[in-house]
C-alpha cells in the first residue's frame, strides 16, 4: 500500500509543474486568439483531468470506461496544444469497458509518447489505444526528437511496478526501431 501511495505521489508530482504550465500556455493562446468556446471547453477538460488525478490517483483499480473518459479529457489538452499534428486513435471493444486496470495507467504512456517524439504538421503523430483479446494496447510510432529530452525511465518503471503490485500480472513492452507498444492485461469484473 505504501509503495502504491508513493507511486501515486510521484505520478502527481510528474504531472503538476510541467504539464500545468504547458496547459496554461495553451489556454492563454486560445484566449489571445479569441477562441472563447474552445477556451471554455479547454478549462472544463483541464479541470476534469486534475480532478480525476486527485480523486482517483490513490484508487487501485478503475474500469476501462472511467479511464477512457479521463483520457478523452487529457488528450483534448494535447490536441489543442498540437493542433492538426497529434491524433488519438481509440478502438475499444465495448465488452471490455467494464473490465478494470490500475488507475492512471494510460497517462504516463501518452505523456512519454509526446515527450520523446517529434510532432509536426508535415508528419502528424498518432497514438493508438485499442483492445486485443483482453489486453489494452497503447502504441505509437517512434519519431525521435533531434535533441531528445532526458529520460529517467521512472514513469514506465513505475507503471510496470504498480501494475504488478495491484494485479499480480505484468505488462508487455515492445520497443522496436519503428514503434513503441505497451500491452496491459485487463481484469474481468468480479460478478
Question: Which residue stretches match the model-derived regions?
Answer:
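Two-component histidine phosphotransfer core
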Residues: 1-185
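C-terminal end segment of the histidine kinase catalytic
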Residues: 189-191
